[in-house]
Structures are given as structure tokens and as C-alpha cells.
């Protein structure tokens, strides 16, 4: 059986916030602030949903993504060091 291809951090993060419906604030490179929940993403864009409306945001326009709540995607440092 072929070994799994490791996911990059960006895909892991976006998949985590999508599955858990974590509310996000996305800042664009031009300073615009968008808020919502990720419903879909690919290599080039993110689909953000808020109040029944969807926005397709191109990743090259994104500066920063800030979750609305603390998230824990990986084991804590002590747990990871022990493995």
C-alpha cells in the first residue's frame, strides 16, 4: 500500500476550520476584513459563508487568517516530544 502524502500546513488548517465550522476573520492584502466560515477550498481559493451569503476569495489576495476561537490542531509540545 502506498504511503499517505503529508498535507501541508495551509491545507491542514483550512480543513480543520472547515470541518469544525470555526468562525474566521480573513484580512486581505488591501486591508479589507471578511468574516465567516470556510465551506470549501482548493489550491487557489476559499469559499467563505456568512449570513446565508457566500464569497469566493482568491488565496493570493489573503494576508492573514485569524480564527474566532482558540484551535488545537496538533498535540501539545510535551506530548509530541514524548512520541
UniProtKB/Swiss-Prot annotation:
Species name: Methylocella silvestris (strain DSM 15510 / CIP 108128 / LMG 27833 / NCIMB 13906 / BL2)
GO biological process: regulation of DNA-templated transcription; regulation of RNA stability; regulation of translation, ncRNA-mediated
Organismal lineage: Bacteria, Pseudomonadati, Pseudomonadota, Alphaproteobacteria, Hyphomicrobiales
Subunit architecture: Homohexamer.
Keywords (A to Z) from UniProt: RNA-binding, Stress response
Domain named Sm: residues: 11-71
CDD domains assigned to the protein according to its UniProt record, in alphabetical order: Hfq (cd01716)
Protein name as it appears in the record: RNA-binding protein Hfq
PANTHER family, alphabetized: RNA-BINDING PROTEIN HFQ
Entry-linked HAMAP family: Hfq
